[in-house]
Amino acid sequence: MAYEDLIKSIESAAEEKKQEVLRNAEREVEAILREAETESSAIHAQYLEKAKRDLILENNRQKFLAKQEVKKRISAVRQKLIDDAFSRSKEKISGIRSDPSYPALYERLTREVISALAGEEIILHIDPADSKICSDVLKKTGIVCDIMQDITTIGGLSGTSADGRIRAYNTLESRMERIRDTSTLEIINLILGGPDG
């Protein structure tokens, strides 16, 4: 019996050792699983945080693009309003030659050209429709210069020095362009009631 007791004792010790190894293995597995779960949660949190950042960046990018598109459209509308305003203005002044005040305006425009080219031998460039008014203005002012009927304009004139190095544009179109170039913001304010509409 001692032999059987010895075997039972060995089997019992082996069983205990086996159970202890299994318990230790289970504890290690549980620890590994907890650690893996913690790491998984951390990785998940990192990916979630990155996804949130990416969404915020994309949202901001989309907002920026939308704002740019709105600004572009507003700018196009403003430009169209300005273009329309200048077109209407040009239409209104296209018949200025028949206005009784045109000779006085033409004289003032001529004096400005002459003044801009003071000290130079002057050539006036006029529209053939203004030849009589130009002659009358030159007679009235006593200014002597060459006249070339070589431009087409709704009104006004331009002048050059004889060598062509100096030019003075004083047509109504050139004056409107100068106004357009220097007064766009003011025009927008008048049309829309402020720089931002």
Curated annotation (Swiss-Prot):
InterPro entries: ATPase_E_C, ATPase_V1_Esu. GO terms for molecular function: ATP binding; proton-transporting ATP synthase activity, rotational mechanism; proton-transporting ATPase activity, rotational mechanism. One of its GO terms (biological process) is proton motive force-driven plasma membrane ATP synthesis. It is a peripheral membrane protein. The keyword Cell membrane applies. Keywords: ATP synthesis, Cell membrane, Hydrogen ion transport, Ion transport, Membrane, Transport. GO terms for cellular component: plasma membrane; proton-transporting two-sector ATPase complex, catalytic domain. It is found in: Cell membrane. Its main location: membrane. Belongs to the V-ATPase E subunit family. Has multiple subunits with at least A(3), B(3), C, D, E, F, H, I and proteolipid K(x). HAMAP family: ATP_synth_E_arch (MF_00311). Component of the A-type ATP synthase that produces ATP from ADP in the presence of a proton gradient across the membrane. This is A-type ATP synthase subunit E 2.
